[in-house]
Regions:
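Tryptophan-paired
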Residues: 24-79, 158-257
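Sparse, context-dependent recognition of short Cys/His-centered cofactor- or disulfide-binding micro-motifs
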Residues: 11, 130-134, 223
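Short, surface-exposed loop/turn motifs at beta-strand boundaries within globular domains
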Residues: 19-21, 129, 140-142, 157
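Short, low-hydrophobicity acidic/polar segments
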Residues: 34-140
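Surface-exposed interaction/gating patches
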Residues: 139-155
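Short amphipathic, basic-aromatic surface patches that mediate peripheral association
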Residues: 1-19, 149-154
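Structural beta-strand/beta-sheet cores of well-ordered domains, especially the beta-sheet scaffolds
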Residues: 134, 143-145, 162
Length: 257
């Protein structure tokens, strides 16, 4: 028995597993929801277009679950799994830091891409030695945002004059890829730099000119964004402020995810 992973829930609608996924951790649970087998693989072997993971399982019914992209727990940590642990125990949590001045947790890293997958399989008796291959679709649980701030008047902008952040409660993901109740998390930039953009400026009643101006560019990576009941939860917001704390923009970022 073999399992193939597929990540085609992306803008290109093409399988990008070999290009984006660097590690795989697979769990198999029996019909009682107990862990009976797990395996890890990472590195160059995943980049081969024909990669599959061998399922060292006896014939029977199983629920397979995968967290991919953990990369030694550099960005996310999954609960330690021991034999007979329950499927519901295997949740995944964002590594975060505590801002002692505000008491609010934050992340300022370019998070390693995280993926989740699940699949129910029935493995038949394989007395004839045949090969059975199953396909697990993956969902990406991280998002990278590149924010470009420019002045409509054509005035240059200094990136060092602004702060950018995204606020949400989405750093704790359950075994079924839903969000668990979590504390507020502020995602800070991991890269800011100055860029250039062309701005169309009116020079008269019927004439305009395109001028190159400096813009501020910020990059942030966040955990899983999902639609929720906004009467119960606060919307995840992109917040832009001046260094003096003046609010420049507050944007519901999930509308652009």
């Amino acid at each position: 028995y073999h399992l193939k992973f597929r990540y085609d829930m992306n803008m290109k609608f093409a399988d990008a597993f070999t290009h984006e996924v660097k590690s795989v951790r697979l769990y198999a649970f029996n019909s009682n929801g107990e862990l009976v087998w797990q395996a890890d693989e990472q590195g160059e072997i995943l980049a081969s277009g024909d990669y599959t993971m061998k399922l060292e399982l006896a014939p029977g019914d199983y629920h397979l679950m995968a967290w991919c992209g953990l990369d030694n727990g550099e960005s996310f940590t999954v609960t330690d799994a021991s034999h007979n642990c329950r499927m519901t125990d295997l949740h995944c949590k964002l590594n975060r830091y505590l801002d002692k001045a505000t008491g609010v947790s934050y992340s300022n890293k370019d998070l390693h891409p995280l993926f989740h997958g699940s699949l129910d399989v029935s493995l038949p008796a394989n007395d004839d030695g045949g090969d059975y291959t199953y396909v697990m679709p993956l969902t990406k649980d991280t998002n990278v945002f590149r924010v470009v701030l420019q002045h409509l008047s054509g005035q240059d902008i200094n990136v060092d004059d602004f702060t950018f952040s995204i606020e949400d409660r989405n750093g704790w993901i359950a075994h079924d890829n839903t969000l668990k109740e979590d504390e507020p998390i502020v995602y800070r930039t991991w890269s800011t730099y100055s860029g250039e953009a062309g701005v169309d400026i009116a020079t008269g009643k019927e004439s305009r000119v395109t001028t190159i101006v400096k813009v501020a560019v910020a990059e942030l990576t966040v955990s899983r964004l999902v639609l929720r009941d906004w009467s119960l939860y606060s919307r995840p917001m992109l917040i832009i402020r001046t260094n003096e704390g003046k609010l420049v923009a507050s944007i519901p970022i999930i509308d652009y995810a």
